[in-house]
Amino acid sequence: MDLGVKPATQRLYIGIDPGVTGAVAAIDQKGQVISLQDTPTITVKRGKVLRREYAEPAMAALLEGILQSAGAAYCPCGNPSRHLMQNVLVALENVHSMPKQGVASSFSFGVGFGVWRGIIATLGLPHERVEPGVWKRALKLTANKGTAVAKALRLFPRAELGHAFQGRMIYSDGRAEALLLAYYALQQANSKTPLKSKA
C-alpha cells in the first residue's frame, strides 16, 4: 500500500478531515508536507445503490504508516514508539450536523469521526478535536470550501491537492482542509497556545 510518506524531521502535525471524501495530512515543524492522502473507502452495494463507505482497517494502516515512517526519523535509538507521544499532535475536525444536511449525510460524517477517534485513541496519540468555525476563523477562511482550497494552494504550492480532468484541475477540498488543520495545529504549537477544542 503506497502511503505517500516522506521522511519526517522532529515534530509531526496531523490534520484529519473526517468526511467520506475527507483526507489525512501530515506536516513537519517547518511546514513541509510529509503525507497527504484521501480517506480510504470501499464501494458497497446497499440494495440497488452503490455507496462509498469507510475502510476502517485501511484507515488505521494509513495513520500507522505515517507514524512508523516519522518515528524512525525522530528516534536515533531505534525505538520510535518511545518518542512518538512527545513529537506528534493530531487535529481532528469536530463534526456536528449542519443546516440543510440530510440525515444520511450527517450519519455518515459522524461514523467517520467516530472511526478516526477510535483509531487515534487506540494508537494513544495526543490529539485535539477542533471546531470548524474555530480553525477556519483563525486562518481567515469562510464557510465556502473554495477558500480552503485557495489557502492551501498558497501555503503548500507543491502539494497534490487535485487531479486533471478534461483539461482542467479538479481540487479536493477534503485534502485542502486536512492540510489546513495540520497547519492550524502547527501555528497553535508555535504560539504556545493550546488548540481551542470542544471536550
Over which residues does each language-model region extend?
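Phosphate- and other anionic-substrate recognition elements at nucleic-acid/protein interfaces
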Residues: M1-A199
